[in-house]
């Protein structure tokens, strides 16, 4: 069967369902596809098809995730749904599923539960920009006051984790009733998608961000100078642009790009996603190395101290068999290189077990170009023992 072409006519947004186990995340995902399928904007996926999430391995970590796609009048969506709580933790921290926004599903019959809180915290840790709430199972609650109470509790919880709890759209509905075709509840799904369309912001495209290219290799072309190669992570760069070489050294160096090539062909401009070689003016081979980045001057700084949220691999995932303690000194792998760093655990945390999710403070032995949101792997003896994301940079 020939593959269909992906038509890029609408903005693309990545979202996912989050919330406590059995509050109806997967049923809601199925209901969204059913309601939109009736408008010709999705392919209906039944609960069972989504629930049998295929097992994926992302950086050695086993994750079960279901990917569903659909569109509204305004946008094209890729939607992720995970069957188990551990899958969410791994998925969000390792960045296997980037979310531009999330639908938090809360059962009106139960109110917020422990994982409701954990998933809101996770969304905060990994920088999910916006959340819309779907109060599910409203057909089981006759008492208007009870619904208001649940809504109030969830809004307070969102405020606690620095989401604008008072502004977030709340949609009341029943995913199961919508699947059964009950018009009142089908309308609630339509309202939910309108809220997602309007409240979750369209992400800025990588091409529009400031230029950044991690350096993978450095070599000299006789008579021309030093060339660095790598894949452009974001932004654009033209011949003649000023760039800064950041990381690993005390001083960042500014230089000019005097030539760009891709697939052995010369070009004037490169952009996010391109694998390129950049010729740098007046830079000797020994002044630049793998692990540094080429960036728009002033757009990123080198740091040795940062805080991060990490997921620690289990031994089944190839991680450690034993816990680690305060002062643990593994390697931190950022973009293209490993740097040794020391881990400081939060107050009151004695040790970290395989399978845990924890916030850590790190001090690296060399400065690296880091910023909030950057993902990293924690490695020991060449194998990954944890996967994480920078939550804050200090100095």
Curated annotation (Swiss-Prot):
Subcellular locations according to the entry: Cytoplasm
Residue numbers spanned by region G2: 60-64
Enzyme class: hydrolase
Catalyzed reactions: GTP + H2O = GDP + phosphate + H(+)
Region (G4): 136-139
InterPro entries documented for this protein: EF-Tu_GTP-bd, EF-Tu_GTPase, EFTu-like_2, EFTU_2, G_TR_CS, P-loop_NTPase, Small_GTP-bd, T_Tr_GTP-bd_dom
Residues covered by the tr-type G domain: 10-204
Family: Belongs to the TRAFAC class translation factor GTPase superfamily. Classic translation factor GTPase family. EF-Tu/EF-1A subfamily.
Function: GTP hydrolase that promotes the GTP-dependent binding of aminoacyl-tRNA to the A-site of ribosomes during protein biosynthesis.
Record-linked NCBIfam families: EF-Tu, PRK00049.1, PRK12735.1, PRK12736.1, small_GTP
Name listed for the protein in its UniProt record: Elongation factor Tu
Organism (species): Symbiobacterium thermophilum (strain DSM 24528 / JCM 14929 / IAM 14863 / T)
């Amino acid at each position: 069967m020939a593959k269909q072409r992906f038509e890029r006519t609408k903005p693309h947004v990545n979202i996912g369902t989050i919330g406590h186990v059995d509050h109806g995340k997967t049923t809601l995902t199925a209901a969204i596809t059913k309601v939109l399928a009736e408008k010709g904007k999705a392919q209906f996926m039944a609960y069972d098809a989504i629930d049998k999430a295929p097992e994926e391995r992302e950086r050695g970590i086993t994750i079960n995730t279901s990917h569903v796609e659909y569109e509204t009048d305004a946008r094209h969506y890729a939607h992720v749904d995970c069957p188990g709580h551990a899958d969410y933790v791994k998925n969000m921290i390792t960045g296997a599923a980037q979310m531009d926004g999330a639908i938090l599903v809360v059962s009106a019959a139960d109110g917020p539960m422990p994982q409701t809180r954990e998933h809101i915290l996770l969304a905060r840790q990994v920088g999910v920009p916006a959340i819309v709430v779907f109060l599910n199972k409203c057909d089981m609650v006759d008492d208007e006051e009870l619904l208001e109470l649940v809504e109030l509790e969830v809004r307070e919880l969102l405020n606690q984790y620095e989401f604008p709890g008072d502004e977030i759209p709340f949609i009341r509905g029943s995913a199961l009733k919508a699947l059964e075709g009950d018009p009142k509840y089908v309308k609630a799904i339509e309202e939910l998608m309108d809220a997602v369309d309007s409240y979750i912001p369209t992400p800025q495209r990588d091409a529009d961000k400031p230029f950044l290219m991690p350096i993978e290799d450095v070599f000299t072309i006789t008579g021309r100078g030093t060339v660095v190669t790598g894949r452009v992570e974001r932004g654009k760069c033209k011949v003649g642009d000023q760039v800064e070489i950041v990381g690993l050294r005390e001083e960042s160096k500014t230089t000019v790009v005097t030539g760009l090539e891709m697939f052995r062909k010369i070009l004037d401009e490169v952009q996010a996603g391109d694998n390129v070689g950049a010729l740098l003016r007046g830079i000797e081979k020994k002044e630049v190395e793998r692990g540094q980045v080429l960036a728009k001057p002033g757009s990123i700084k080198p740091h040795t101290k940062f805080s991060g949220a990490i997921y620690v691999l289990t031994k089944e995932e190839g991680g450690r068999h034993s816990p680690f303690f305060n002062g643990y000194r593994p390697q931190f792998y950022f973009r293209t290189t490993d740097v040794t760093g020391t881990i400081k655990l939060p107050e009151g945390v004695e040790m970290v077990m395989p399978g845990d999710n924890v916030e850590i403070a790190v001090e690296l032995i060399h400065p690296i170009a880091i910023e909030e949101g950057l993902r990293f792997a924690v490695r020991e003896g060449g194998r990954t023992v944890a996967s994480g994301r920078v939550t804050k940079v200090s100095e």
